[in-house]
């Protein structure tokens, strides 16, 4: 017999989902901090455009961090909440000393690839256990990353920074 949590989901499957969400949380925290560093330190001919875009991205990332942590709590888990835990858990690595706009964009693109893969895993598991709430939280993130990737392609074409 299955044991259900307060929102009617299988407790064991919910724990697995919490682990995935905590992994995503850790990756978003490192992504957020990288974005802050890029925002503060970017230099070059595209400074103004990149500086503003990086701020937009880090403001968005920190909102996602809070929403993911709240979803972990809803699933009766404990969100990771120390930087050392984030560093240990995250696949996204801390980036330091980067001021070149091209390199910043390349790092962001790589990080977005990691995030979208992790979001796909969460969406699949949430669908499997009937967790519509987690799907409602994560699906918009997934769609936003697709839009960001498209905007990045347009930016690269317009500025020719990778050619």
Which residues does each predicted region cover?
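Conserved alpha-helical segments that form or flank metal/cofactor-binding pockets of metalloenzymes
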Residues: 42-84, 155
């Amino acid at each position: 017999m299955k044991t259900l949590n307060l929102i009617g989901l299988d407790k064991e499957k919910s724990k697995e989902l919490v682990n995935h969400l905590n992994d995503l949380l850790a990756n978003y925290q490192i992504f957020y901090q990288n974005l802050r560093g890029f925002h503060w330190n970017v230099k070059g001919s595209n400074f103004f455009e990149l500086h503003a875009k990086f701020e937009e991205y880090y403001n968005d990332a920190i909102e996602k961090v809070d929403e993911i942590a709240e979803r972990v709590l809803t699933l009766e888990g404990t969100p990771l909440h120390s930087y050392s835990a984030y560093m240990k858990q995250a696949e996204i690595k801390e980036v330091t000393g980067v001021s070149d706009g091209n390199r910043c964009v390349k790092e962001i693109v790589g990080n977005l690839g990691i995030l979208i893969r992790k979001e796909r895993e969460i969406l699949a598991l949430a669908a499997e256990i009937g967790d519509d709430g987690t799907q409602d939280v994560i699906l918009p993130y997934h769609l936003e990353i697709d839009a960001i990737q498209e905007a990045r392609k347009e930016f690269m074409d317009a500025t020719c920074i990778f050619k």
